[in-house]
């Protein structure tokens, strides 16, 4: 990371509540939300922040949603939050957790008001429309939990690893033209600010010259000691594969384990995509 970016993200660390002790609000407080601009990290990996050559969404699942009904009785639910990858900002995850905690003792007349309030606040925070769905537990009791992504699992490859900082030079192709769906459960990086581990699974769908599987797995494992937010890691993987492997089409989909009741699931693609039907829940989630 260059010096300018270090200063930007140090300011984020100082101004946000990541890595700091926090007080919890007794009542609704949208001021707890903290945006983080996408542009600086995209410039670092040569992704034009204003480009329309890639598409995607960030989807968050929140498993600890609660408020009070008009009689003061607690309601519990789950929320699905999604927004386009071209929003100017992402939401800092701890600030989202603190915001949702501020709803715990707040009275709402109905779930529609809860949804409208959350959508309005998050859209204002990131400068782009945010879709919010809130589900009572009865509606998601039958939700399927998948053991793994579809595709060929790279993790069965018997490779030797010694590089744990991002190394795109591991990426290479042969002349054979293929369409493949690959995945790994070995993705691990660290939070850019707190250095806490982020655990995830990643699926790679592409068409083009065949990517060397061993090299791709080594590349994914090389994120192990890398410090970046979830969304930035998935965009870096997308950008590196596009640069070093030059596929005709590419989709990179990350699903991370939860922290503070939240999991983050970014998807980036060369193709226009919608998130409907994509929000599968993996076994570690």
UniProtKB/Swiss-Prot annotation:
GO cellular component entries: cytoplasm
EC number: 1.7.1.13
Residues binding substrate, per UniProt: 91-93, 230-231
GO annotation terms (biological process): queuosine biosynthetic process; tRNA modification
InterPro entries named in the record: GTP-CH-I_C/QueF, NADPH_dep_7-cyano-7-deazaG_red, QueF, QueF_N, QueF_type2
Disulfide bonds: none
Binding site for NADPH: 93-94, 259-260
Pfam family, one: QueF
Keyword field contains Magnesium: no
Catalytic activity: 7-aminomethyl-7-carbaguanine + 2 NADP(+) = 7-cyano-7-deazaguanine + 2 NADPH + 3 H(+)
Keyword vocabulary terms for this entry: Cytoplasm, NADP, Oxidoreductase, Queuosine biosynthesis
Signal peptide start and end residues: none
Pathway per the UniProt entry: tRNA modification; tRNA-queuosine biosynthesis
Subunit structure of this chain's protein: Homodimer.
Family from the record: Belongs to the GTP cyclohydrolase I family. QueF type 2 subfamily.
PANTHER family: NADPH-DEPENDENT 7-CYANO-7-DEAZAGUANINE REDUCTASE
Function, in words: Catalyzes the NADPH-dependent reduction of 7-cyano-7-deazaguanine (preQ0) to 7-aminomethyl-7-deazaguanine (preQ1).
Protein name from the UniProt record: NADPH-dependent 7-cyano-7-deazaguanine reductase
Native species: Legionella pneumophila (strain Lens)
Origin organism lineage: Bacteria, Pseudomonadati, Pseudomonadota, Gammaproteobacteria, Legionellales
Gene designation per UniProt: queF
